[in-house]
Amino acid sequence: MKHTYPMVFIYNEDTRVYNGYIPDLTLYCEGETLENVYACAEELIQYYFELATRHDTEVPLPSTLEEITNKWTGYKVSLISADIK
């Protein structure tokens, strides 16, 4: 099953690293490229769901893209999906 969450992208000019933040799950990752951040985020979402299942923990529903975009004005916001087994 595929799960999709909004992710906020922040580019750090000092370190030249992209940061990705998934507010609904409180997950954070970074990478030298956007592709690295997407790959990292996908793995984190999969791991999050794996742990939530293992520990019988409720997973928050995703916010809408509009909600996150309005909250994180001035930042790039995109959707990230992960296949959960």
Residue spans of the language-model regions?
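A short, exposed loop/beta-hairpin motif centered on an aromatic-Gly-Thr core
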Residues: 25-36
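Short aromatic-glycine-(Arg/Gly/Cys) micro-motifs in beta-strand/loop hairpins
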Residues: 9-23
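A ubiquitous short alpha-helical element
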Residues: 8-9, 32
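Short, charged, surface-exposed hinge/linker loops at domain edges
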Residues: 1-6, 39-85
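Structural detector for hydrophobic anchor residues on beta-strands
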Residues: 5, 18, 27-29
